[in-house]
Amino acid sequence: VLFRSLIMWLFGWLGRRGKVISTPKKIAIGMGVAGVAYLFMTLFSLGEGYPSGTEFRDMTAAGADVVKAGWWVLILYYFFMTVAELFISPLGLSFVSKVAPKNMQGLCQGLWLGATAVGNLLLWVGPLIYNNYPIWVAWAVFFGVCIISMGAMLAMLKWLERVTA
């Protein structure tokens, strides 16, 4: 709730200064912020030399304790992911209702939420990667997906802004 209030305040503050950020641009920024979270996890895991999930399970308890991340890593990661989610999810649903034809708004909103469900179904890719490779590889793949998604939004930005104007 705190982050939502801060971000809404930021949008209002920018709007009062004539620097309104379009919804498609906010979604692209959200993907970039998620990318920052995954880049942080990639670099941190790489720097710490974290093993794959399979290698971690085979370690002794003493060895496993050495390669566990501190609480601050999770807090920083979740901070970025929460901010990214605030840029993407509610704005995406609002954007869909703006651009969908009146007689198809419900269907289009359902498709937006369905896309989220499909994304959740693809979560098996993470364990597939991190059980066979050092965990930084999984974070790097997620980083790449975020950057590609952000790039796709930015590539369509002018068209999307024209459609919503």
Question: Which stretches of residues belong to each language-model region?
Answer:
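Cytoplasmic membrane-interface "Motif A"-like loop-to-helix N-cap segments
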Residues: 13-32
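A gly/Pro-rich, aromatic-decorated transmembrane alpha-helix motif that marks the paired
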Residues: 36-43, 117-129
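Loop-to-transmembrane helix entry/capping segments in MFS-fold secondary transporters
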Residues: 72, 102-111
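C-terminal ends and interior cores of transmembrane alpha-helices
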Residues: 29-66
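Symmetry-related core transmembrane helices of the 12-TM Major Facilitator Superfamily/SLC fold
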Residues: 29, 136-158
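Transmembrane alpha-helical cores of Major Facilitator Superfamily
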Residues: 32, 79, 110-114, 118, ...
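Intracellular juxtamembrane helix-capping segments at the cytosolic ends
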Residues: 86-100
